[in-house]
């Protein structure tokens, strides 16, 4: 177990003090995009510095497809295999720096709601996420996952370009 790290907190700039770090559990919403990979690197650095652990949460968008499309299960299985390989790569990096990491994969249609639900039920102290993901133009029409998460989250959110 890493030694307890200190963090500076301030009521205002004239009233600052060092206390035990409140960063214990960092969530990285992850889609294997370059943005989420960079977010993971920031989370890894913070976890190492503060003695926190990381949960990497991948919520693969469950498309509502017509029932006549037979190959959705095959597509979902391929997505799952790709994400499992990514999780292995992230776990290896965390192990190298002695950071505890957990991975979780969900197949859902409500991405932001599932991120927020996970945060609330798992004592997450910080979310580190990319400013963009793999969503493309369709996701832009419905709003940014990063923006919605940062506006609704009960904890600090770090957005990484």
What are these regions (language model features)?
Residues 55-57, 102-106, 158:
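General small-molecule cofactor/ligand-binding pocket signal
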Residues 16-70, 95:
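Small/aliphatic-rich secondary-structure junction motif
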Residues 1-37, 152-161:
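Intrinsically disordered or low-complexity boundary/linker segments at protein termini
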Residues 1-17, 21, 92-127:
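Structural beta-alpha unit
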Residues 71-75, 120-122, 145-146:
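Short, hinge-like loop/turn segments at secondary-structure boundaries
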Residues 126-152:
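Glycine-rich, Arg-bearing micro-motifs that act as flexible, cationic patches
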Residues 2-16, 58-85:
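Acidic, proline/glycine-rich short linear motifs
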Residues 59, 130-132, 161:
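Short secondary-structure boundary segments
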């Amino acid at each position: 177990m890493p030694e307890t790290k200190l963090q500076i907190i301030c009521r205002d700039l004239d009233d600052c003090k060092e206390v035990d770090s409140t960063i214990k559990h960092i969530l990285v919403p992850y889609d294997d995009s370059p943005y989420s990979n960079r977010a993971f690197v920031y989370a890894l650095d913070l976890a190492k510095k503060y003695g926190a652990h990381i949960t990497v949460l991948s919520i693969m968008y469950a498309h509502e497809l017509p029932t006549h499309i037979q190959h959705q299960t095959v597509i979902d299985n391929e997505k799952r295999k790709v994400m499992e390989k990514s999780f292995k790569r992230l776990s290896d990096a965390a192990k190298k720096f002695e950071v505890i990491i957990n991975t979780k994969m969900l197949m859902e249609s409500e991405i932001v709601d599932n991120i927020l639900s996970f945060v609330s039920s798992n004592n997450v102290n910080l979310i580190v996420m990319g400013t963009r993901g793999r969503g493309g133009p369709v996701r832009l029409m419905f709003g940014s996952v990063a923006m919605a998460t940062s506006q609704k989250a009960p904890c600090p959110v770090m957005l990484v370009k």
